[in-house]
């Protein structure tokens, strides 16, 4: 099971997450409690292992701005949380992830229409896109087609207490956590460690 830690804002957390086995780190450039500047993101990314995915999170940003930040920071993927369509995705010409809020099984069908490398299924959006700590009914994704499952990233309120059930139900390619590995709004490296251990153990 691949694991993504999202909302990275400091070097120490990023390095520790990689040491503990994180496969991907997320850097939020959209409005968020976890927003990071491109300059700081670049400093962190330059110190990370080559095999770890560096994912930039954007919401309804222009293609030009996304391309500039991607190139300057050394991102490997972009994660799109807004109303981006296939025309914009094609123009980006960057490995991409489309985030969709899940409210019904029909969201699986909608997901198959996007020309992205991965689909991230999340809780329906609130004030901020993602990172709200709320789950959605995982059983809505229990019967997805194999070709979609193989590119599915599961997010939305995941933590050490529910990650095993979430993985058993959805069987995604990757799981994504942000608020579930925080204490009082800050990333907690011990929670990150335990989350990664549990996610990888229950998928063996």
Swiss-Prot record:
One of its GO terms (biological process) is L-tryptophan biosynthetic process. Pathway: Amino-acid biosynthesis; L-tryptophan biosynthesis; L-tryptophan from chorismate: step 3/5. It catalyses: N-(5-phospho-beta-D-ribosyl)anthranilate = 1-(2-carboxyphenylamino)-1-deoxy-D-ribulose 5-phosphate. One of its GO terms (molecular function) is phosphoribosylanthranilate isomerase activity. Keywords: Amino-acid biosynthesis, Aromatic amino acid biosynthesis, Isomerase, Tryptophan biosynthesis. Its EC number is 5.3.1.24. It comes from the Bacteria. SUPFAM superfamilies: Ribulose-phoshate binding barrel. Disulfide bonds: none annotated. It is an enzyme of class 5 (isomerase). Gene3D superfamilies: Aldolase class I. Pfam families: PRAI (PF00697). Belongs to the TrpF family. This is N-(5'-phosphoribosyl)anthranilate isomerase. It comes from Bacillus thuringiensis (strain Al Hakam).
